[in-house]
Structure formats: structure tokens, C-alpha cells
A protein has these predicted regions:
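Transmembrane and membrane-interface helices of multi-pass
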Residues: 2-7, 12-225
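Soluble catalytic regions of membrane-associated enzymes that act on cell-envelope
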Residues: 207-259
Length: 259
């Protein structure tokens, strides 16, 4: 009887622990995958230096955006829908990373999302035969490395999207940390050295180089909807409305000496 009672008490605990996630992949995977892609894109970019002050901004924006995606995926109450959304988002992002790298290495510039969308039809119909041998195959090592997170997302999908969904406090924690990373990165970029590249003088080429691909895509969409910020006017420190009461000093004219 004692052994049966022990089995009854131990069986529910085993069932409960088996349904728990075996690791923090349900919220760590997307920040790690996004940071991996950003660092990979930066490492293969021969036109920019890897270790610069902007590396901090790239890391902050990547972690913030990755935690945001983890939050969105964990908001799905159905595991199947969350799995499909996570794989689809990772696949689309991977394709964008590969396309931007090919544009950077072949055309020497990162292209805007709108330009890539408009150019996609021309590439396939116009010179699609030359894309594979001239653009894709020489950059195959980068493309294979870029698809590593997608392969892991498919293989580890049961550990990334677990049966037990996150609770409210866990989701709130993700939101706070996401806003913390994003807020620090935005503050450093907006009021730092690269203020002009982050605001009124933003371009995709400089944006990806200084802030990362995910931050550049976010800024491009934001400025397309709300417009670019206006540049700051220089502060002259003088007020033209206040009259100048300084007495005028005149030099007396003495004929024969001032000529």
C-alpha cells in the first residue's frame, strides 16, 4: 500500500514537469537569432568596420526587436498558430537578410524595402538568368550561414513554442525588457553622434551600417508613414527683438591727421 501511495503522489508531479519547457528558448531564440543575423551581416560587410561605437546600437536594437517578437509569438494561445507564425517570420527575415547582403556586396549599397519590392519583378523577368551564377553562388557561404536560425527554428519548434504558454507576469517582463533595450538604443541614437543619420538624414544604407537591419526597416516604415523629422535649427544665442542700447563710440575727425 505504501508503494502504491508513493506512485500516486509521484505520478502527477512527473506529468507536470514533463510539460514544462526544457529551456528558455521560448523567449531567448528570437533575440539570439536576430542578433546572430545582425552580427553576421556586419562581419561580412567589407565596406564597414565591425568593432565601432555603433556596434552597441546594433546589439541593443537587435535584442529589443527579438524580445518583441518573442512577446508576439507567446501571445498566440494556440501552439500550432504560434509555430507557423514563428517559422514564417524567421523565413521572411532570413530572405531579407540574404537579399540585403547581396545588394550590399554586389551593388555596394543597402537598398530600401520599397525599392527591393519594386525591383523584385524586374530582377526575375529582366536578368533573372544572371542572378544565380553572378550574385547567389559567389555568396553561398553567407547564405548558408544565414539559414542556420531558420533550420534551428524548424528543428527546435517544440522547444521554442511550448505547450505551456507564458503567463501574464512573464509577458509583462518581456515587454519591460524589450522597451528597456529599445529605449536605451533609441536614446543613444537620437541624441548621440549619429543623430542626423537616425532622424532627418536617414537612408537605408547608413541606417543598416549604424543601427542594424531591423532598426533600419523600422525607421523606414515609420518615416514613410509619418514623414522624416525636421533638422534642428542652429542656436545663435542672440535675440533680434531686443534693441541694442550700446552707445556708439565715434572717433573725432582731426583734419590733417586722419588721412
Amino acid at each position: 500500500m505504501n508503494e502504491r501511495d508513493r506512485k500516486k503522489h509521484t505520478t502527477p508531479s512527473r506529468l507536470d514537469t514533463s510539460s514544462l519547457p526544457r529551456g528558455p528558448l521560448n523567449w531567448v531564440f528570437f533575440p539570439a537569432a536576430l542578433l546572430y543575423h545582425e552580427l553576421l551581416l556586419r562581419a561580412f560587410d567589407r565596406q564597414s568596420t565591425f568593432f565601432t561605437g555603433t556596434l552597441v546600437l546594433v546589439v541593443l536594437f537587435a535584442l529589443g526587436a527579438g524580445l518583441f517578437w518573442s512577446l508576439l509569438i507567446n501571445l498566440f494561445r494556440h501552439r500550432r498558430a504560434a509555430t507557423i507564425a514563428s517559422i514564417a517570420a524567421t523565413a521572411l527575415w532570413t530572405v531579407l537578410v540574404c537579399v540585403e547582403y547581396c545588394c550590399r556586396s554586389y551593388f555596394k549599397s543597402y537598398f530600401a524595402l520599397s525599392f527591393i519590392g519594386n525591383m523584385a519583378g524586374d530582377v526575375v523577368g529582366g536578368f533573372g538568368d544572371t542572378v544565380l551564377p553572378d550574385v547567389v553562388l559567389p555568396r553561398l557561404p553567407f547564405i548558408l550561414l544565414a539559414f542556420v536560425p531558420l533550420a534551428l527554428c524548424i528543428l527546435l519548434r517544440r522547444r521554442i513554442v511550448t505547450e505551456q504558454r507564458m503567463g501574464r507576469w512573464s509577458l509583462l517582463f518581456l515587454l519591460v525588457v524589450c522597451l528597456l533595450f529599445g529605449g536605451i538604443g533609441s536614446g543613444l541614437a537620437r541624441w548621440g553622434t549619429y543623430h542626423d543619420a537616425y532622424t532627418y538624414n536617414f537612408t537605408t544604407d547608413t541606417g543598416v551600417t549604424h543601427f542594424g537591419l531591423n532598426a533600419s526597416a523600422r525607421l523606414e516604415i515609420t518615416y514613410a508613414i509619418f514623414g522624416h523629422p525636421s533638422p534642428r535649427l542652429p542656436d545663435t544665442g542672440t535675440n533680434t527683438d531686443v534693441p541694442d542700447n550700446t552707445p556708439v563710440v565715434t572717433t573725432p575727425v582731426v583734419y590733417g591727421e586722419n588721412t
